Amino acid sequence: MFRKRNVKGSQQKKAALRVVEDDVECLATPPVVPAKKRKIRELDDTSRSAVRASGFGRDHVSAGTQEAVARATDDAPDRRAESSGARTAVGSNVRTRVVMDYQPDVCKDYRQTGFCGYGDSCKFLHSRDDFRAGWRLNEEWKVGQTEARDLDSIPFRCVLCRGHYRAPVRTRCGHYFCGGCFARRVRETRQCAVCGADTQGVAQSAARLRELLAAGAGAGDSPDDTPAEEEPRSPGEPAAGEERRGAESG
């Protein structure tokens, strides 16, 4: 038996035609542009048309105008510096350059000893001047302030014996005592006599203390009334004044 033949081409053609009609409608509809962008675009078109109507386009700029624009561009850094007060105004035909020599070629041997084995044939400069960097020169004033601050914080006499320092030492907490006074106190307690911190029985020699006190003129003491240094005495040995008082009483 023969089956009935079904024709399918007619339905496919109708579907294809329907798709083509939808595409044509989409192409014919203009895209939706937001109102803000549309306004900006209209302003740009208006300005371009005005420039074209005046004949002042990009291709019609005169040579004088180009030169003026170039001069204004070159002088812009100078004008900014002038307005900020960094330096005085200079002409556009003047350029100033500053070269900083951070490593001067100075002969090290001649500077340290005054003698160089190469003699006059040395390629380095024979100079014994003191060269310092700019930041070092700017910090020279801090040296005096540091010493004055140290003098303010250091008592001009020993806190334990109330006398002048003999073989001064410096504790870990930064306080100064006589060497003998500190040794005798450590046998009793390790706490600092000034702040009460634990010194652990350790102290360093304070060699710069004598220089600081001499620079500060003893903080009110004249050099004449400064007694000569006495050697540290043992814990059981009496002082010289005590011996005299004992002899007078006897």
UniProtKB/Swiss-Prot annotation:
Task: Identify the PANTHER family for this entry.
Answer: RING FINGER PROTEIN 113B, ZINC FINGER PROTEIN 183
The zinc fingers classed as C3H1-type run over 101-129
Which CDD domains is this protein grouped with? RING-HC_RNF113A_B
Query: Which residue ranges are recorded for the region named Disordered?
Result: 44-89, 213-250
Name-wise, this protein is Pre-mRNA-splicing factor CWC24
Q: Does the keyword Transmembrane apply?
A: no
Q: Biological process GO terms, please? A: generation of catalytic spliceosome for first transesterification step; snoRNA splicing
Composition-biased stretches (Basic and acidic residues): 72-82, 241-250
Q: Where are the zinc fingers (RING-type)?
A: 158-196
Task: Could you list this entry's UniProt keywords, alphabetically sorted.
Answer: DNA-binding, Metal-binding, mRNA processing, mRNA splicing, Nucleus, Spliceosome, Zinc, Zinc-finger
The record's section on InterPro entries has: CWC24-like, Znf_CCCH, Znf_CCCH_sf, Znf_RING, Znf_RING/FYVE/PHD
As for subcellular location, the record says:
Nucleus
* Quaternary organization: Associated with the spliceosome.
Q: Which domain of life is it from?
A: Eukaryota
Provide any one GO MF term from the record: zinc ion binding
What GO cellular-component annotations does this UniProt entry give? Answer: Prp19 complex; U2-type spliceosomal complex
Q: Which PROSITE patterns is this protein grouped with?
A: ZF_C3H1, ZF_RING_2
The entry's function note states: Involved in pre-mRNA splicing.
Q: What is its main location?
A: nucleus
Pfam assignment, any one: zf-CCCH
Which family is this sequence assigned to? Answer: Belongs to the CWC24 family.
